[in-house]
Regions:
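Aromatic-anchored, glycine/proline-accented short structural segments
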Residues: 173-234
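Nucleotide/phosphate-binding catalytic cleft detector across ATP-hydrolyzing
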Residues: 1-178, 197-210, 238-311
Length: 311
């Protein structure tokens, strides 16, 4: 892979804050830095961390936070990232956590992924006001190290478009139209391009379909047996309810295909379809779909690449 950031005066970061996971990616001075963690924050305190892989325990503005799995299991009051807002308290702490994970320079420029319906000037202005020109101070309470980082610039980019740039880089489609789909926890983002990489707004949209809809099948089946579980519990409990999950993802593989065929005109005939997102790791799609390599990181990688072009 070509390195996309070679200068050492600032570091470009691609940041994808989802409802389930936060993904951050950067290439700086010939090295790759990345992290994935659950989009959950909560109160933090000193405990033993031996049973946790890559625990996140940080201090921001003299307040201690658990982030990710640690917040989900150990915080007395965990908060999930349940909205599209990138400037809520939860989002701000996730930004601090991402910077703590990958920042290797004291100046960064960030491209933040947003859904189609949030790709607006008003949203951008709110994000710029919240982050741009701000100095981020974050202490890693586990390693007892601190970082002070200036966010020099920040911009937003559609998540589906980010998948496009991750896949295509500087190539231009000349043979067929292309659709790029990022499947998230609650929604899926579609970006559509005609030959020559001309963006088609009419076919680019946010659709209410994601991993939570798939796991609702498991949730309802459990209720039939008087077992009450939240969707995030079903999702995060690896090894539990595997038979029900297998059926859910088999059904979803078929329904997902039908949704795309309905939304995209002449899909699979005149259009190459690329799919990304962590949900793709569970679906069994036919060969007409092109699953992006390491699909859970595709949006963050694409955002970082876009940052190398615009900053």
């Amino acid at each position: 892979m070509n390195r996309i950031q070679l200068e050492n005066d600032y570091q470009v970061i691609g940041l994808d804050i989802g409802r389930k996971n936060t993904k951050v990616y950067s290439e700086f001075n010939g090295e790759i830095y990345g992290a994935i963690f659950s989009s959950i924050i909560g109160d933090g305190r000193d405990i033993k961390f031996d049973d946790y892989k890559d625990p996140i325990y940080i201090s921001v503005d003299n307040t201690d936070y658990f982030v990710g799995e640690l917040a989900e299991k150990e915080s007395y009051s965990p908060t999930r990232n349940s909205s599209d807002s990138k400037i809520s308290l939860t989002a701000k702490i996730l930004v601090h956590s991402a910077i703590s994970k990958v920042a290797k320079c004291d100046k960064v420029r960030i491209v933040l992924g947003v859904p189609n319906n949030a790709y607006r000037k008003q949203v951008l202005l709110g994000i710029i006001e919240t982050y741009q020109g701000k100095i981020i101070k974050v202490k890693d309470k586990i390693t007892n190290t601190s970082k002070t980082v200036l966010i020099e610039m920040i911009d937003i980019f559609r998540e589906g478009d980010a998948v496009c740039y991750d896949v295509m880089r500087d190539r231009i489609n000349t043979d067929k139209d292309m659709a790029f789909i990022s499947v998230g926890f609650r929604t899926s983002e579609i970006s559509y391009f005609e030959k020559g990489m001309n963006f088609i707004d009419r076919l680019s949209k946010t659709i209410p379909y994601g991993n939570q809809h798939i796991l609702s099948y498991v949730q309802n089946k459990l209720k039939e047996n008087n077992i009450v579980k939240e969707l995030h519990e079903i999702d995060s409990n690896v090894g539990d309810y595997d038979d029900l999950k297998r059926i859910a993802y088999e059904l979803a593989s078929e329904s997902f295909t039908q949704k795309i065929e309905t939304i995209i005109e002449n899909s699979f005939v005149q259009t190459d379809v690329y799919v990304a997102g962590g949900t793709m790791l569970h679906l069994s799609l036919d060969t007409r779909f092109n699953t992006v390599e390491n699909p859970i990181m595709s949006v963050a990688r694409g955002l970082a690449y876009v940052g190398s072009l615009i900053f």
